[in-house]
Amino acid sequence: MNELINICTKNTRLSKAQIEYLDKISLLFPFIADISYSQVTMYVRDRVKSLIIVAQAKPHTSFFQYKPNSIGSMAKGSEEPLIWRTFRFAKHIQGKREWAVGLLLDMYTFPLYDSNGEMVAVICFETNY
């Protein structure tokens, strides 16, 4: 079982079909990261409404300072306000994030819906391009 499926099965209320849908989308992340010159990250809500990173890809087309793999890590809404607002209001949001001291990145968040119109994840693009 791959990591995304394992994390979602253990920590979320997503259905098997929703998890498989997210898994298929995550397979495109390396390509999406390269053509968007962005780090691409997928967040889902866990059972207690914290956020979990379930997929991530860094671009090969632009330089990003080293940041450890965050897959499986959890965050509270206060730690990821743009992600949380995207979950709450189901709208695309643009903002900034401090990647390291003094280094701001542009951040774009998008809600991701399943075939029934239910929001299942947020995809975030972070770029310094």
Predicted ranges, named:
Residues 1, 18-19, 49-54:
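Short, functional N-terminal and low-complexity linear motifs
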Residues 1-2, 7-18, 122-129:
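Juxtadomain coupling helices with adjacent low-complexity linkers
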Residues 4-7, 11-14, 22, 65-68, ...:
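Generic, low-specificity signal for short hydrophobic/alpha-helical stretches with a mild N-terminal bias
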Residues 17, 70-72, 97:
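A generic structural signal for short
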Residues 19-33:
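Short amphipathic alpha-helical segments
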Residues 29-92:
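Structured interaction and signal-relay segments at domain junctions
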Residues 76-129:
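Sensory/regulatory domains in signal-transduction proteins
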